[in-house]
From Swiss-Prot:
The keyword ATP-binding does not apply. This is Large ribosomal subunit protein bL9. The keyword Ion transport does not apply. The gene is rplI. Belongs to the bacterial ribosomal protein bL9 family.
Amino acid sequence: MKVILLQDVKPLGKKGEIVNVSDGYARNNIIPKKLGVEATPKNLNDLKLQNQHADKVAQENYESALALAKVVENTKVVVKLRSGEGGRTFGSISTKEISAAAKEQHGLELDKKKMQLNESIKALGNYEVPVKLHPKVTANLTVSVVEG
């Protein structure tokens, strides 16, 4: 019997796959536990429609990430860092401060977890901070750390 998996089933496959299993295994294990449904023409059509919808949503997310990347690339965020005599700084700038400054100055809601900053910024100057907006889209945000 052919079955469409509704969840990942360890020995059989992943969600959305069509697998061939014995009739007894399907009727006594897969279908009652709602791990899958029989691959009838109606269910196959529903699966096809779900896949088309998922592809469309993924494409829209990708396009919106590209549009946001263009905005992020052209944005300069200014963050103030306390400093003393001789240019010695106190404290550091983390992704949390950069995210808050981007929201305050430009209205950009950037997730601090998506900023790929290896270590905190501890000196004055200009920095490029990579922001992963989508698995395929990364943009560089310009951060200017000034004396404040």
